[in-house]
Amino acid sequence: MDCRLLNEKSRIFVNADPYFVSDYVNQHVGSHCIRLPKSGCPEASLNHSTFGSLDLCRISYGGSVRVTSPGLETCYHLQVLLKGHCLWRGYGLEHYFSPGELLLINPDDRADLTYSEDCEKFIVKLPSVVLDRACSESYWHKPSEGIRFTTRHNLQQLDGFINLLGLVCDEAEHTNSMPRVQEYYTGIIATKLLEMLSSNVSRETFSEGCPSFERVVQFIEDNLKQSISLERLAELALMSPRSLYTLFEKHAGTTPKNYIRNRKLECIRARLSDPNANVRSVTEMALDYGFFHTGRFAENYRSTFGELPSDTLRRRKMKWLDPEESLPPLP
């Protein structure tokens, strides 16, 4: 498959021990285990870049490697086959993915994948809160069990999507990319996935309650650093607190309290990732957004984004180091 997704600016490993690459992927992209062939010495390569809430990864293990994962928990994986093939096993079925196909792994899906020796993939890690937000902003209905996509997709049927991924990669490797641009592109990717891929989301917009919900959401956005009471939101929506819960369940698939917390966490992550933002400490940032129990804040952050806030801040600082100094040592 001929496409340009991440270049040498994002290179982390070249001709490296697959276990070194796997350890790095476990930290940044998703929890998994690998099993190498008994013979031969595969050499793995990895390009990786962050872009707002997204992690972008181009990976090859250089051998017939089996990759298993019990589940991603808080994120989705979009895996685009670039070279070779990849055997997927799940739900009693098997399928050989080839270049031009897209494998989508839901947060609670078990993964069992076997790479061919020449297999190369491009992977996008997308937090579930980003998709939830795109769903609520479009006034679509998210099922209570969460958003789930079908597994197999053909990129030829997803008009312009590979070009969108290319634009995101170019922007991610641009050192002066602005957080607002990152959030804009991230939202487009999430909305495009909901529009183009088969899922359990009902895309019928709800005619009743939308003005009230939009008014409440805008108030939340304008007051994220303030204490927001459910009574105030119910007053804005011109309804009872009980009806407010129903409104949020219908349009956001969650409770008002969880919605507010997730928006605060998303804003904090954006600030921690922004090289131009003045961030003195994670604790100060948490307190600024009303998280007074820092231990609970860190746990909420990790359960939402798959990493601690200190990890996000540390990765931002790494980008400003000399490129050779910021790379992990090769084996």
Swiss-Prot record:
Q: Where is the HTH araC/xylS-type domain?
A: 214-315
Principal subcellular localization: cytoplasm
Which Gene Ontology terms describe the biological processes this protein takes part in? catabolic process; positive regulation of metabolic process
Cellular component annotations (GO), alphabetically ordered: cytoplasm
Compartments where located: Cytoplasm
Keyword Cytoplasm listed? The answer is yes
Give the matching SUPFAM superfamilies. Homeodomain-like
Residues forming coiled coils = none
Q: Does the keyword DNA-binding apply?
A: yes
UniProt keywords (A-Z) are: Activator, Aromatic hydrocarbons catabolism, Cytoplasm, DNA-binding, Plasmid, Transcription, Transcription regulation
Q: Which Gene3D superfamilies match?
A: Homeodomain-like
DNA binding happens at which residues?
231-252, 282-305
One GO MF term attached to the UniProt entry:
sequence-specific DNA binding
**InterPro entries assigned to the protein according to its UniProt record, in alphabetical order:** AraC-bd_2, AraC_XylS_family_regulators, Homeodomain-like_sf, HTH_AraC, HTH_AraC-typ_CS
Its biological purpose is as follows: Regulatory protein of the TOL plasmid xyl operons. XylS activates the xylXYZLTEGFJQKIH operon required for the degradation of toluene, m-xylene and p-xylene.
This chain belongs to the protein called XylDLEGF operon transcriptional activator 3
The coding gene here is xylS3
